[in-house]
Amino acid sequence: MNLYVLGSSSSGNCYLLYNERSILIIEAGVPFKELNKLHLFNLKKVSGCIITHEHGDHASRVKEYQDKGIKCYASSGTISKLNENVKNISLFNSEDFEVFHFPVDHDASDPVGFYIKSGEETILFATDTYVLRYNFKELTSILIECNYSMDILNENLKNGKLSASRRDRTIL
């Protein structure tokens, strides 16, 4: 199983897990044209797109992906916020990827992380969360997407809520 990162930031998130037969898209936060530019991308191989939560940097391109024939999947709470014909993540079915979702803590409606299995490989994917409440065993890869705000860090430093060394560790 291979990984290609198209975007991991506040302006858009999108990751491709792929093998010789299939592509699994994680997050719908970058334009489809960016996917289509990739030499490894083949629309016929796409198993689907799984989405962690409804925030724009993760889900703003759902309709665009669906218009290209890509089935998108998310949790019930996320589906209720998207106003698109997104399928429940529990319905995702692929010959090459087994996807299990689990709840994470974030300011969204029903955000989830993913435990993905393909052959002998397992990947843990978690984004925009400050804690993972489960223990995962026998992982071959861990993908954690996280951001920070320099303004908030500096404000917390100024107010004594954060030490300078901790702020510096965050930004390095």
Task: Please place each PLM-identified region on the residue numbering.
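Glycine-rich phosphate-binding "P-loop"
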Residues: 1-6, 92-105, 164-172
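Conserved beta-strand hairpin/beta-sheet module of binuclear metal-dependent hydrolase folds
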Residues: 1-39, 112-128, 141
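Short loop/helix-cap segments at secondary-structure boundaries that form the rim of catalytic
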Residues: 62-65, 79-85, 94, 133-138
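Catalytic core of the metallo-beta-lactamase
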Residues: 92-149
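Structured catalytic core of nucleotide-sugar glycosyltransferases
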Residues: 11-14, 54-55, 99-102
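Active-site metal-binding motif and surrounding structural segment of the metallo-beta-lactamase
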Residues: 31-77
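Cap/insert and terminal regions of metallo-dependent hydrolase folds
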Residues: 136-172
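Short, hydrophobic beta-strand segments that form beta-sheet elements in well-ordered domains
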Residues: 24-27, 48-51, 69-76, 82, ...
